[in-house]
Curated annotation (Swiss-Prot):
Role noted for this protein: Bifunctional enzyme that catalyzes the enolization of 2,3-diketo-5-methylthiopentyl-1-phosphate (DK-MTP-1-P) into the intermediate 2-hydroxy-3-keto-5-methylthiopentenyl-1-phosphate (HK-MTPenyl-1-P), which is then dephosphorylated to form the acireductone 1,2-dihydroxy-3-keto-5-methylthiopentene (DHK-MTPene).
Species of provenance: Saccharomyces cerevisiae (strain JAY291) (Baker's yeast)
InterPro entries in alphabetical order: Enolase-ppase_E1 (IPR023943), ENOPH1_eukaryotes (IPR027511), HAD-like_sf (IPR036412), HAD_sf (IPR023214)
Protein name: Enolase-phosphatase E1
Catalytic activity entry: 5-methylsulfanyl-2,3-dioxopentyl phosphate + H2O = 1,2-dihydroxy-5-(methylsulfanyl)pent-1-en-3-one + phosphate
Pathway: Amino-acid biosynthesis; L-methionine biosynthesis via salvage pathway; L-methionine from S-methyl-5-thio-alpha-D-ribose 1-phosphate: step 3/6; Amino-acid biosynthesis; L-methionine biosynthesis via salvage pathway; L-methionine from S-methyl-5-thio-alpha-D-ribose 1-phosphate: step 4/6
Annotated family: Belongs to the HAD-like hydrolase superfamily. MasA/MtnC family.
GO cellular component: cytoplasm; nucleus
Pfam families in the cross-refs: Hydrolase (PF00702)
Length: 227
């Protein structure tokens, strides 16, 4: 069925990598770093410009606010910038590697036009795909898939993933017709929003993903080998 499309738009969490990666690896790494980051912040620190955008002067209140956003899974663009900054340190130091599914790695490598759309910042997306755990090599080895990806979109570039206009924005930016694009995600609200502009959709059904009510109304993909 994948041969019917020239362009693929992929979600990340629960689609190309386990949904547990964010909850069990990325989020704990971030929250562990927040107290030190906030308390040691100065006007000259690299992260000062990001923290100042929260407009909270008291450091204890700022720290509590950031951790609350994480706990409530708020898709805040400033939080996403801050997470990208901290995760960069983890990826570059070798402490974090992305467990992208082997079939997703193969899919990204063999398809001509692949784009990524995630609520995580574009910077965080590039880091994730730049430090992918190589499934065929020792644990310390990683793959860089960025050269195979044609573009990245987030809530700052395109809008919220549950809004139809966001997908219209992406179609405009990639210069594609809706009929040429297949969007894959584990979130039915995102699939419905994309379908609103005529984009074909596929529900990613990966281990650990939450059950989807009325899942039978979607084309379901347990892996990407058939695409």
């Amino acid at each position: 069925m994948g041969d019917n499309y020239s362009t693929y738009l992929l979600d990340i969490e629960g689609t190309v990598c386990p949904i547990s990666f964010v909850k069990e690896t990325l989020s704990p790494y971030f929250t562990k770093k927040v107290p030190q980051l906030v308390q040691q912040d100065t006007r000259d620190s690299p992260v000062s410009n990001i923290l100042s955008q929260f407009h909270i002067d008291d450091k204890e209140q700022l720290q509590a606010h950031i951790l609350e956003l994480v706990a409530k899974d708020v898709k805040d663009p400033i939080l996403k910038q801050l997470q990208g900054y901290i995760w960069a340190q983890g990826y570059e130091s070798g402490q974090i590697k992305a467990p992208v599914y082997a079939d997703a790695i193969d899919f990204i490598k063999r398809k001509k036009r692949v784009f990524i759309y995630s609520s995580g910042s574009v910077k965080a997306q590039k880091l994730l795909f730049g430090y992918v755990q190589d499934p065929n090599a020792p644990a310390h080895d990683s793959l860089d898939l960025n050269s195979y990806i044609d573009g990245y979109f987030d809530i700052n570039t395109s809008g919220k993933k549950t809004e139809t206009q966001s997908y219209a924005n992406i179609l405009r930016d990639i210069g594609a017709k809706a009929s040429e694009v297949l969007f894959l995600s584990d979130n039915p609200l995102e699939l419905d929003a994309a379908a609103g502009v005529g984009i074909a959709t596929g529900l990613a059904s990966r281990p650990g993903n939450a059950p989807v009510p009325d899942g039978q109304k979607y084309q379901v993909y347990k892996d990407f080998e058939t695409l």
